Swiss-Prot record:
This is Kinesin-like protein KLP1. One of its GO terms (molecular function) is microtubule motor activity. GO terms for biological process: cell projection organization; microtubule-based movement. Keywords: ATP-binding, Cell projection, Cilium, Cilium biogenesis/degradation, Coiled coil, Cytoplasm, Cytoskeleton, Flagellum, Microtubule, Motor protein, Nucleotide-binding. Residues 441-535 are annotated as: Disordered. Residues 348-371, 579-657 form a coiled coil. It is found in: Cytoplasm, Cytoskeleton, Flagellum axoneme. Belongs to the TRAFAC class myosin-kinesin ATPase superfamily. Kinesin family. ATP binds at residues 91-98. It comes from Chlamydomonas reinhardtii (Chlamydomonas smithii). GO terms for cellular component: cytoplasm; microtubule; motile cilium.
Length: 776
């Protein structure tokens, strides 16, 4: 890890007042604030008037582009190199924090750090063609000490969100939506969509004051390539827009806005306490006091490259707020973070890395053996046949039938296996000796007992007695002619060779391919442009006006073009039909591929069987020539291809039925909407649309939707923007896409949560103020 100091920059809001008391040093890094003495304190007044601060830079009357170059360019470059980064704006309300981070509305030249950082990231992605990148974005809001997901499907809920730590002590928000984006336009569209869900309110100092803290995060995953995907570098950039601190006696807020100001000031106060504890190097740092400090834990003292923007409003009436902001910024500048490269700890990636390293080490061993004049040495694990042969060699060695040179010693693996085999054979021999000794003792005891009883009859085993006095020893008896010692099995019997081919999934259906099932489905989307039978009230009315079905279909065609509801439903039906057709085509293609792979497997299996039958086997087992080996490799590849195509075919079949149902539902919905519309129209309107619809009969399918005047204007506007500034095309396109979308606050207001209640309370307070004549 590398110690990295937190950089702090000051950005001033332009002001028309000349005698503001704020002076900038000639070095561009120092700031002096002159606070006049309070004359009401009396003649003895030791109040300090001059305050000086030094930072990493001061931005006064600079453009948004210059601000981005100074504040964020280096951080984004570090992000692309695999390091975490955070940029947060701090200051009083109305000082320009949101303008610095997000920008000035729809003006492209006034876009803030977030849109410019998105453009920078995707420009670097396009330039680095030798690497593979995946980019995700998330947008978090902290409102009244509650977390909200501004990009989630249900942004009104916050119960599932929680700030946690991973195994590397990095903070993350559980349950926060990560949206994958593939282009600058998609990322900007998500940002603009999240902006619509932010909570704002107006007061005397700011007409659109942010009532919450927001964190827009860009997550970047970098790999060297798809083939060599064993190393992944993960990094993220947090772009934080803090709500402004307020003096309620100046803003004059009441009711719900006052409550929000209290939460904002409380969270910023705890943030200041956390910074003070870090600057003093206390053993305990209160990161968990608020959601804001928990989210900013890495930015203040963890693995992150952090930049702070202190926004100040250099007006004489705001000297106290300016001085407070500069003091906080000077304390933040004393902090340091531990910067380290962030590599993924995914077990799958580690497995790929270890496999590659093992392969490289084996190649190096083979090269060393070749250079040292050794023969081909195998460093792989021993097979079952090799283990059985090794045990037999060790047994012969212990019985004195083999020499030490017969034991393998060409690699450490074989030496270890030899010692294991020697131990196993020794244990087995020892067990045999123990069994034989037990048998001898039992026979001796039985013989001694029979001699003591003086019996002269043969025992159950047919072994006679011998006079101990005549032999001078112990009796062992006479073994019968059919007696033999038990045969002890070897450590393992040679197994039978592999027989039969592998099971290759389901066989082909006779008379048809694997795609026969797909082709048997009814093409529910092939005739999606026909009005169908009109037996409902609207259809009955159309049948009464028009005698032939062609006129009814003509009205139906115009309904899909001229009526907004019909145009949307027809587009949905067309999209569902196209998706269904693509799935069917994919099933047919995959079915043919599976059948071809199965046929190729059968051919290769037969050829390999013939080759094995024609090649005599050696004494130690089968010896494969180059042609048989090539057939085996090709057979293995064919089986792998068969399994891949078969799994894809199975997945496509599972998607087919839901898509057929989707086409049927879309078609039924279109016909039902057309029926309702036709029942409510006049005869003149229907006849006019029938005439226009008959004129469309010569138009080819897919060419019915001609551009209207508005669409032509948009096309011309996009072309003009592309000619003037190609880099701004993504910004304007994303802004247009999200501008036509449904506003997020309306969705949030129905969520039944704290934000919805706050919006309802603020609306009620505004209504009461209007009734009392205090507002408009």
């Amino acid at each position: 890890m590398v110690k990295q100091a937190v950089k702090v920059f000051v950005r001033t809001r332009p002001t028309a007042t000349s005698g503001s008391g704020l002076k900038l040093g000639p070095d561009g890094q120092s700031v002096s604030v002159n606070v006049p003495k309070d004359l009401s304190a009396g003649p003895v007044n030791n109040q300090q008037e001059q305050f000086s601060f030094k930072f990493d830079g001061v931005l006064e009357n600079v453009s948004q582009e210059a601000a981005y170059t100074t504040l964020a360019h280096e951080v984004v470059d570090s992000l692309m190199a695999g390091y975490h980064g955070t940029i947060f704006a701090y200051g009083q309300t109305g000082a320009g924090k949101t303008f610095t981070m997000s920008g000035g509305g729809t003006a492209y030249a006034h876009r803030g750090l977030i849109p410019r950082a998105i453009h920078h990231v995707f420009r670097e992605v396009d330039m680095r063609a030798d690497k593979m990148y995946r980019v995700h974005v998330s947008y978090l809001e902290i409102y009244n000490e509650q977390l909200y997901d501004l990009l989630g499907d249900t942004p009104g809920t916050s119960d599932a969100l929680a700030v946690l730590e991973d195994s590397n002590s990095n903070t993350y928000v559980r349950g926060l939506t990560l949206v994958p984006v593939r282009s600058e336009e998609e990322a900007l569209a998500q940002f603009f969509l999240g902006e619509q869900g932010r909570t704002t309110a107006g007061h005397v100092l700011n007409a659109e004051s942010s009532r919450s803290h927001t964190v827009f995060t860009i997550h970047v995953e970098m790999r060297t390539s798809d083939a060599a995907s064993e190393r992944a570098v993960l990094s993220k950039l947090n772009l934080v827009d803090l709500a402004g601190s307020e003096r309620t006696k100046k803003t004059g807020v009441t009711g719900q806005t006052l409550k929000e100001a209290q939460f904002i000031n409380r969270s910023l106060s705890f943030l200041e306490q956390t910074v003070n504890a870090l600057s003093r190097k206390d053993t305990y740092v209160p990161f968990r006091q608020t959601k804001l400090t928990a989210v900013l834990r890495d930015a203040l003292g963890g693995n992150c490259k952090t930049v702070m923007v202190a926004n100040i409003w250099a007006e004489p009436s705001h000297n106290e707020e300016t001085l407070s902001t500069l003091r906080f910024a000077s304390r933040v500048r004393t902090l340091t973070t531990d910067l380290a490269l962030n590599e993924s700890n995914d077990p799958a990636l580690l497995l790929r890395r270890y496999e590659r390293q093992i392969k490289e080490l084996k190649a190096e061993l083979a090269m060393r053996d070749t250079l040292s004049g050794k023969g081909r040495v195998s460093y792989d694990d021993l097979t079952d046949d090799e283990l059985r042969e090794l045990h037999a060699t060790c047994r012969r060695f212990l019985h004195g039938e083999a020499e030490p040179e017969d034991l393998p010693a060409d690699s450490m693996k074989r030496v270890r296996e030899t010692f294991k085999a020697l131990r196993a054979v020794h244990v087995a021999i020892k067990a045999d000796m123990a069994t034989q000794m037990a048998t001898l003792r039992r026979a001796t005891e039985e013989g001694s007992g029979a001699a003591a009883r003086g019996g002269d009859s043969a025992g159950p085993s047919g072994v006679g007695d011998v006079d101990l006095r005549a032999t001078g020893g112990f009796t062992v008896g006479h073994a019968p002619l059919d007696a033999r010692p038990p045969v002890r099995s070897e450590l393992g019997s040679p197994g039978a060779g592999a027989s039969g081919a592998e099971a290759l999934g389901e066989p082909r259906s006779p008379g048809g391919g694997l795609h026969a099932q797909a082709s048997s489905h009814t093409d529910a989307g092939s005739n999606w442009g026909d009005a169908g039978p009109l037996s409902s009230p609207g259809g009955t009315r159309l049948a009464g006006i028009f005698g032939v079905s062609g006129d009814r279909n003509a009205v139906f065609r115009r309904y899909k073009v001229d009526v907004g509801e019909g145009r949307e439903l027809a587009a949905s039906l067309k999209a569902a039909s196209i998706a269904l057709a693509d799935t069917k085509a994919s099933i047919r293609s995959l079915g043919a591929s599976v059948n071809d792979a199965k046929q190729r497997i059968d051919e290769l299996s037969s050829a390999l069987a013939l080759r094995r039958g024609a090649t005599p086997a050696g004494g130690d087992g089968e010896v494969l020539d180059s042609e048989a080996y090539a057939l085996m490799q090709e057979l293995k590849s064919a089986k792998s291809r068969y399994r891949t195509d078969f799994d894809s075919l199975k997945s496509a079949r599972e998607e087919l039925e839901p898509q057929i149902q989707a086409v049927a539902v879309a078609r039924a919905g279109l016909l039902e909407a057309f029926d309702r519309w036709a029942a409510a129209q006049s005869d003149t309107t229907l006849k006019r649309m029938a005439t226009a619809g008959r004129a469309m009969s010569g138009i080819a399918p897919g060419e019915e939707d001609e551009m209207d005047a508005g669409e032509q204007f948009e096309r011309m506007q996009i072309a003009r923007i592309s000619e003037r500034d190609p880099d701004s095309l993504a910004f304007h396109t994303a802004l247009k896409r999200t501008g036509a979308a449904v506003s997020r606050p309306a969705t949030v207001a129905t969520g039944g949560n704290a934000k919805a209640a706050a919006m309802a309370t603020r609306k009620m307070e505004h209504t009461q103020a209007v009734n009392r004549g205090l507002a408009r």
